[in-house]
UniProtKB/Swiss-Prot annotation:
UniProt record similarity statement: Belongs to the isochorismatase family.
Full protein name: Nicotinamidase 3
Source lineage: Eukaryota, Viridiplantae, Streptophyta, Embryophyta, Tracheophyta
Keywords: Hydrolase, Pyridine nucleotide biosynthesis
Organism: Arabidopsis thaliana (Mouse-ear cress)
Catalytic reaction equation(s): nicotinamide + H2O = nicotinate + NH4(+)
CDD domains: cysteine_hydrolases
Highest taxon above the source species: Eukaryota
Length: 198
């Protein structure tokens, strides 16, 4: 059964195709653990479903290596950015074991997983035409990545129950906006049915 948010906001229905899809797990890091922990089981479930369906999985890690790469985030966050090499920058322990190779990790220093990374190139190289977005924060890095994926020509599926942010109001605003113009909404149950047939 679809989650209430999926039913409430979805405007179009479509299932992802495991042959051309990839999963993007956004910023499941210690810095965001208060938001990430409540959705951890759904994130792990989604990763498991995708692995069982032979859907490639990519993880992002947000971090800053020097003051020169802070960009507007430095101003917006009053300099409180995630610094590389700190505990805050590390992927949370429960997710670390899911990362199976260096090609799966995308290092980024802004909201988008596509900006100044090789993500698009790596997706296109393996024939990916659809992306499934999960992780944190719903309304910042997840939403920006989803919107940019759409603009770049990828079909986007956005999880309602494996994404999270500061509060439900911001979370639902993103779901409403993405469903209106950028993404098909999915949840763990819908992904299980569409990718595994059960």
């Amino acid at each position: 059964m679809a989650s209430s948010s999926t039913r409430k906001y979805e405007t179009r229905k479509r299932d992802p195709n495991s042959k051309i899809a990839a999963l993007l797990v956004i910023d499941m890091q210690n810095h965001f653990s208060s938001m990430a922990k409540p959705i951890l089981n759904n994130v792990l479930t989604t990763i498991d479903i995708c692995r069982r369906a032979s859907v490639p999985v990519f993880f992002t890690r947000h971090n800053h290596k020097s003051p020169t790469d802070h960009g507007m985030l430095g101003e917006w966050c009053n300099g409180d950015v995630i610094l590389d090499g700190t505990t805050d920058s590390e992927i949370i322990q429960e997710i670390q074991g899911q990362v199976t190779g260096p090609d799966e990790m995308v290092e980024k220093n802004t909201y988008s997983a596509f900006n100044k990374t090789r993500l698009q190139e790596n997706l296109e190289k393996i024939g990916v035409k659809e992306v499934i977005v999960i992780g944190v924060m719903t309304n910042l890095c997840c939403e920006t990545t989803a919107r940019e994926a759409f603009i770049k020509g990828f079909r986007v599926f956005f999880s309602t129950d494996a994404t999270a942010t500061f509060n439900e109001e911001l979370h639902e605003a993103t779901l409403m906006n993405l469903a209106f113009g950028f993404a098909y909404l999915v949840d763990c149950d819908k992904l299980r049915r569409s990718l595994l047939g059960n």
